[in-house]
Amino acid sequence: MSAKSTAWVQTALLALALFLLNLYICRELFRIEYLPFMGSIEGAFIGISRYIQAHWSDLTWYPLLNDGTPFPTTYPPLLNLTVALVASLRGISIAHAYHWVTALAYCLGPVALFALVLRLTASRWAAFVAGLIYSSVSMSAWLVPDIARDLGSPFFPRRLQAMVFYGEGPHVSSITLLTLALLCLDLAIAKRRAPYFLLAALAFAATATTNWLGAFAIVLIVVPYALAQLGPRGWTWRHFAWLALIGVAAYCLAMPLMPPSTIAVLQMNAKSTGGDYSSAYRSGLLWGSVILIALAAIKTAMRKLAPHLQFAVLFAFLMSLIALADAWKQIAIVPMAVRYHLEMEMALAILIAVVAHALLRDRPRWIRAASLATLLLALIVPIRMDRKYARGLLRSVDIQSTIEWKTANWLNHGWTGGRVLMPGSSAFWQGAFSDVPQLWGFDQAVTDYTIRVAEFAFYNTDPAFPQDGEDTVLWFKAFGVQAVGVAGPLSNVVWKPYRNTKKFEGLLQPIWRDGPDDVIYRVGAGPASLARVIPRNALVSKAPLHGLDVDPLRPYVAALDDLSLPRADFRWTTAHSAEISATLESNQLLSVQMAWHQGWHATANGKPTPVLRDAIGLMYIDPQIGGPSKIEMVYDGGTEMRAARVISLLTALLLVAAFIVSFSSASRSRKRPA
């Protein structure tokens, strides 16, 4: 066997060893359908994947959460699309497929890191050390006491716990893709050929469309990488031009799955998802300037070191600063900064491996071998503890015994109305078991911010407030909620949102109970239709100042409660189109209780009519005609989505054409006689 073949075999065996190590740790996850951690947000991802599997040809509008939302806004959809595809191809449930896909991403993470460090250092053993540390040592638990307490021991695997207990499957998957994306970028910059350009653009697009934290982490890894290349023999403007072109191409490819309006929604919600991060936006320019100055200073101090060593230090510094400033000092440089501790673990693994390689590279072979053997021996106990922890963590649950499943099952068989609002974890999991639409699902996908304003009020109002229940019911009716679930102190629902769990007793009719503390109430007695005929002067024309300001809602809700008004029949014709039939008088219009989006269009009796937005973010149509009216509504995403599809398609065609030309040129060069 040639030396080159031997090297390839050694590389493959080391990569396989890392994969098998992680498989050893989390192997049960490949077989599990449902885990017992119902507070995990993975229920929402399973629900979206379930919807995808049932609507492959119609993924435009998602009507099941947040009063309806564009499909790309539900969540970066690549992982959910992959889960639905795996479930269909393998003939397994969506929940099983979700765990199978995320387990695979977990096992491939250290393999991807191995490939990246191998590319940067040209050392298989440095790459193996990076992958080994990333697989078996949770450095965030050693650096952040709260994480160690959450795990139970700093020796336990944080990456696995975050993925399984909290539902960080998309985040963990995006880190795997991020590592591969930087590898592809390094190849593309070095080779400057179309095939590598295509791979890099695809890898970055895949990262961004898997998880929003992963999308922002692209910036956090590319900036240190590019800065490390500066120097007398480093990058020129052409290299930066290639980098910019790859970034533009990646976004153009991803644009239909993350259009500008979706990014704007994310920015709006990120200010208050998981905490108050408005200060991070206000101080963003200041922190950005400070960080760039710090990176430049570190770069200057290390200017004589190899670029890969500079990158390792710069990347580890940046990720540690972001995660630890939040964990230690509660300084959020970016929204949800502490969640970047998973990227920090990867960065520190790179740093340790690269520094060790630099220190031992010129040492005798026996010293390098002894150092590696010492590391392997030292990691035996942590690996065994990881496995013991995983064995206790990765256990199945009878899903039909959970309150989340029972609630959704009753909605499937006992509920004949429209939109509902379930509490806490039942809302996370509702889409996994049911097609009944809900007011909420999770905060990141809310396009109508008034929903979040109202939710804060009806969950957190002081029980002593005299109109607490009545005002909450006004909000419910305004947003088309026809049933509401409440979880009391004895409920098994994870995260019980209502401060006053008795606020609806005697006010609303209970229609389902499970034990003493889980109850669903009916809201109002009106029809289930999403379209309602109301007088023009009843439209909500003034935005409430806050969640307790319900006076602007009163005329609108009074019209909704007025059963003498004409009935409007709303019927979905596809997942993104509907028909409304109603008889209108000249002073009446149609209120459609879905979140407004500019991508909706309508015709009234065949003539175009605008779809307008009221003061609480819902749609209304004012055809200004009397008598029988047939309204046809269609969602196509509007000009933005049409442009996004065209741009993405043209970018893909250009990249494929460049790939073909490059491949043909290379083939002709090989055939040309010397």
Model-predicted segments: where are they?
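Start-transfer (signal-anchor) and selected internal transmembrane alpha helices
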Residues: M1-L29, A373-T374, L653-A674
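Membrane-interface helix-loop-helix junctions at transmembrane boundaries of multi-pass membrane enzymes
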Residues: S2-S5, R192-R193, P232-L243, A294-S320, ...
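Active-site lumenal/periplasmic loops and adjacent helix-entry segments of GT-C-fold
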Residues: L18-C184, A206-F216, Y389-D398, V420, ...
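Extracytoplasmic
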Residues: Y24-I25, S49-Q53, L372-D448, L545-G547, ...
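Membrane-interface transmembrane helices that cradle and orient dolichyl/undecaprenyl
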Residues: S173-S174, L178-Y196, P232-R233
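Membrane-interface alpha helices of multi-pass inner-membrane proteins
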Residues: C184, Y196-N211, V223, I246-L253
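Signature aromatic-anchored transmembrane alpha helix within multi-pass, membrane-resident enzymes
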Residues: L245-Y251, H357-R384, P673-A674
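Active-site-proximal, structured, solvent-exposed surfaces of multi-pass membrane proteins
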Residues: P552-K671
